[in-house]
Design a protein with these regions (language model features):
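Short alpha-helix
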Residues: 68-93
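Active-site rim elements
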Residues: 66-70, 130-132
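Short catalytic micro-motifs in class I SAM-dependent methyltransferases
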Residues: 6-7
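A C-terminal cap/extension of S-adenosyl-L-methionine-dependent methyltransferases
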Residues: 92, 96-150
Length: 150
């Protein structure tokens, strides 16, 4: 498997890295990419009550992210087209960190020492991450594909 989680959005042009990822996978191997969701750019500023920024985010793909550095976002469709053109067939995509991403904004914290709470949270996140419309609102998405025969 070839994994690239949280890197693509820091590159101005994703194509060179996507080329390398797809080329590195063996026939039948998995390519796994996580990146920012261009269709949900308004979520974070809206949750932070930065209404002007949220309104502007509907028409942008760039932001200063949580790490304080510029980043860009992709759509599931565009990234699927990129990997498909390089011999990797997209299998599924998931929304990532949908509800846990919002906890801090609501004043609620997840207690990592409460194993029952962690298990329940993970179950809800997994279910939301694979269902529409929930996964479409995730600020990050996870695309999983399989490389075709050589």
């Amino acid at each position: 498997a070839v994994l690239c989680h949280g890197v693509l959005g820091y590159l101005e042009q994703p194509e060179p890295l996507v080329n390398q990822l797809c080329r590195s996978a063996e026939a039948g191997g998995i390519v796994s990419i996580m990146t920012a969701n261009a269709n949900a750019m308004a979520v974070r500023p809206a949750l932070e009550r930065r209404w002007d920024d949220a309104l502007a985010s509907f028409d942008t793909r760039t932001e200063i992210g949580v790490l304080g550095v510029p980043g860009r976002a992709d759509t599931v469709e565009e990234l699927s087209d990129l990997v498909r053109a390089r011999g990797v067939e997209p299998l599924r995509w998931y929304g990532v960190w949908l509800f846990v991403d919002w906890l801090g904004f609501s004043g609620v914290e997840l207690d990592p020492s409460d194993s029952q709470q962690v298990v329940a949270t993970a179950a809800v996140e997994l279910e939301a991450g694979r269902r529409d419309p929930y996964r479409q609102l995730s600020r990050v998405f996870h695309l999983v594909g399989r490389k075709g025969p050589s």
